[in-house]
From Swiss-Prot:
This is Phosphoglycerate kinase. Substrate binds at D22, F23, N24, R37, H60, L61, G62, K63, R120, R172. Its main location: cytoplasm. ATP binds at K223, G310, E341, G368, G369, D370, S371. It comes from Spiroplasma citri.
Length: 412
C-alpha cells in the first residue's frame, strides 16, 4: 500500500487541487472545541500554497441524518479557525455543488484557499437541490456516503488533481474520496495520510521483532479482526480491558458480574487454541461491587468474586505485561486496560502507557481512539513513535483489510 503516488510526486503549480481533509472536529454551540484535526492538515495545505496551487478544501462534519443537522453541521466555523491557523484568508463557500461553487473556483488565483460546505449535506440534499428524507425524517439521498457516481464525477470535474489527506475516512468508500479518485486524471496521498500509511505498514506489515501487540477495550466483537490478523504477525498479544473476561469465561474461570459477550466465548476459545503461547491474559484484576468509581479490591488470581465485576488489570498483571514488553522492538497498543474514566480503575492503562513510553529503541504506535486520548492526557504524546489520527481506519488496517480511500489513489 505504500507504493501510492505522494504529494511531492505531483506538479501542482497553477492547478486546481481538490483536497479531501478531515475537519470532522468536535463542536459546541457553533464553536470548534478541539482544533487538532485542523492543525494536522496544515502541512499539506501550506505545501500546496508554497507550490502556488489553487487549494480547494472539503470535508464532512459529523453525521447528517435530519434537516436540523444542516444548521448544526455547517462548516463555516471551521473556516474561521482554519483562517487563524493558516494566517491567510480562507474563502468559505456555503455550497457543495452548483453555480456558486463553480464560479468561486473559476475565479481563484494561485495560492488562494477555499473551503466548501460539508460533503455529507449531499446525504440529505438530492441532485435537484431538494431536501430528501424518508417517512421517519431521516436522510434519504445518501449521495456522499453511498458513493453516488454522478456526484463523484461532478466533484472530480472541479479540479485537476485530487489529494486525499483524510485518514479518518480512508476505510469508507465515499464520493468525496473514492468517487473523485476514480474520475480524475491525477491523484495522490497528502502528507498526513502518507505518514499514517507508512507508520501502520512499518508496524503491522514489516515489524522489527519481537513484535508485541496490546489489545484492550470493552468488547471482543470490536477487535475480532485485529486479533485474528495480529496472531499471524505478532510474537505476543497482551489482552486487557473488558474483553479479557470473555477470554476468562472461555477458560472456565469465574467472572462474577464482569462484562461478558456470551456469543463470543467460542471465538475466544478458538483464539486461545490458535495463539497458544502468544496470547497473554491478565493474572489478577481490580474488582468492584458496582460499575462506579468506588475503592478497588484486588483479586488474588484470575477469578472475580461473586457479586463483583472486574474493572481494571491488577498489580501482578502490570508487572507481567511490563516483563513481556521489556525486549519488544515493535509495539502497537489499541484500547484501554480498564475503565479509564474512573480514577480508581485507570491504573492499568497508565502503567501500560508508561511502560511503552519508556521503551528504548522500539517502534511504538497507538491505534487512535481511547488509547491515544490516554497517552495525550498523561503527557506521553511525544514519547511514542506515532499516534494514529484514524480510529476506525487504523483498526481496519490492523485487520489486514484494504482501505478503499487509499486503494483508489493512483500508484507511482
Amino acid at each position: 500500500m505504500t507504493n501510492k503516488k505522494e504529494l511531492k510526486d505531483v506538479q501542482v503549480k497553477g492547478k486546481k487541487v481538490l483536497v479531501r481533509v478531515d475537519f470532522n472536529v468536535p463542536m459546541k454551540d457553533g464553536q470548534v472545541t478541539d482544533d487538532n484535526r485542523i492543525i494536522a492538515a496544515l502541512p499539506t495545505i501550506k505545501y500546496l500554497i508554497a507550490q502556488e496551487a489553487k487549494v480547494i478544501l472539503f470535508s464532512h462534519l459529523g453525521k447528517v441524518k435530519t434537516a436540523d443537522d444542516l444548521e448544526k453541521r455547517d462548516m463555516a466555523p471551521v473556516a474561521k479557525v482554519l483562517e487563524q491557523k493558516l494566517g491567510q484568508p480562507v474563502k468559505f463557500i456555503n455550497a457543495f455543488e452548483g453555480k456558486q461553487l463553480e464560479e468561486a473556483i473559476n475565479e481563484m488565483h494561485n495560492k488562494e484557499v477555499i473551503l466548501f460546505q460539508n460533503t455529507r449535506f449531499a446525504d440529505i440534499i438530492n441532485s435537484n437541490g431538494q431536501i430528501s428524507v424518508d417517512s421517519e425524517g431521516k436522510a434519504a439521498a445518501k449521495r456522499e456516503s453511498k458513493n453516488d457516481s454522478a456526484l463523484g464525477k461532478y466533484w472530480a470535474s472541479l479540479g485537476d488533481v485530487f489529494v486525499n489527506d483524510a485518514f479518518g475516512t480512508a476505510h469508507r468508500a465515499h464520493a468525496s474520496n473514492v468517487g473523485i479518485a476514480e474520475n480524475i486524471t491525477e491523484s495522490c496521498l497528502g502528507f498526513l495520510v502518507e505518514k499514517e500509511v507508512k507508520m501502520l505498514s512499518q508496524c503491522v506489515d514489516n515489524p522489527v521483532k519481537p513484535f508485541v501487540a496490546i489489545i484492550g477495550g470493552a468488547k471482543v466483537s470490536d477487535k475480532i479482526g485485529v486479533i485474528e490478523h495480529l496472531l499471524t504477525k505478532a510474537d505476543k498479544i497482551l489482552i486487557g480491558g473488558g474483553m479479557a473476561y470473555t477470554f476468562f469465561a472461555a477458560q472456565g474461570h469465574k467472572i462474577g458480574n464482569s462484562l461478558l459477550e456470551v456469543d463470543k466465548v467460542e471465538i475466544a476459545k478458538t483464539f486461545l487454541a490458535k495463539g497458544q503461547g502468544k496470547i497473554i491474559l491478565p493474572i489478577d484484576a481490580l474488582e468492584a461491587p458496582e460499575f462506579a468509581d468506588v475503592p478497588a479490591k484486588v483479586t488474588t488470581g484470575f477469578d472475580i468474586d461473586d457479586g463483583y465485576m472486574g474493572l481494571d488489570i491488577g498489580p501482578k498483571t502490570i508487572e507481567l505485561f511490563k516483563k513481556e514488553l521489556a525486549d519488544a522492538k515493535t509495539v502497537t497498543w489499541n484500547g484501554p486496560m480498564g475503565v479509564f474514566e474512573f480514577k480508581n480503575y485507570s491504573i492499568g492503562t497508565k502503567a501500560v502507557c508508561e511502560a511503552i513510553a519508556e521503551l528504548k529503541g522500539a517502534f511504538t504506535l497507538i491505534g487512535g481512539g481511547d488509547s491515544a486520548a490516554a497517552a495525550i492526557q498523561l503527557g506521553y504524546k511525544d514519547k511514542f513513535t506515532h499516534i494514529s489520527t484514524g480510529g476506525g481506519a487504523s483498526l481496519e488496517y490492523m485487520e489486514g483489510k484494504p482501505l478503499p480511500g487509499i486503494e483508489a489513489v493512483q500508484s507511482k
